[in-house]
Swiss-Prot record:
CDD domains: KOW_RPL26. GO terms for biological process: translation. Part of the 50S ribosomal subunit. The keyword Magnesium does not apply. SUPFAM superfamilies: Translation proteins SH3-like domain. Keywords: Ribonucleoprotein, Ribosomal protein, RNA-binding, rRNA-binding. One of two assembly initiator proteins, it binds directly to the 5'-end of the 23S rRNA, where it nucleates assembly of the 50S subunit. This is Large ribosomal subunit protein uL24. GO terms for molecular function: rRNA binding; structural constituent of ribosome. It comes from Akkermansia muciniphila (strain ATCC BAA-835 / DSM 22959 / JCM 33894 / BCRC 81048 / CCUG 64013 / CIP 107961 / Muc).
Length: 75
């Protein structure tokens, strides 16, 4: 799939009930799935089990993917 944005671009989210109008920087592009990850736009909470690297575990916030058709390049 051809993409109009790349990693590091400034984008605005143009569709979506909770995220419309937000701006951020593209952290990653997945061309095969047609999604992008925008910094601070769609934060998800993920439960993490305790491991040796993270002995406390708990809830971690991560950035979720947004379909590439829902973002517009700014500037």
């Amino acid at each position: 799939m051809k993409t109009h944005v790349k990693k590091g671009d400034e984008v605005e989210i143009i569709a979506g009930r909770n995220h419309k109008g937000k701006r951020g920087t593209v952290l990653a592009v997945n061309a095969s799935k047609g999604t992008v990850i925008v910094e601070g736009a769609r934060t998800l909470k993920k439960a993490v089990r305790p491991t040796e690297q993270n002995p406390e575990g708990g809830i971690q916030e991560i950035n979720g993917p947004i379909h590439i058709s829902n973002v517009k390049k700014v500037g």
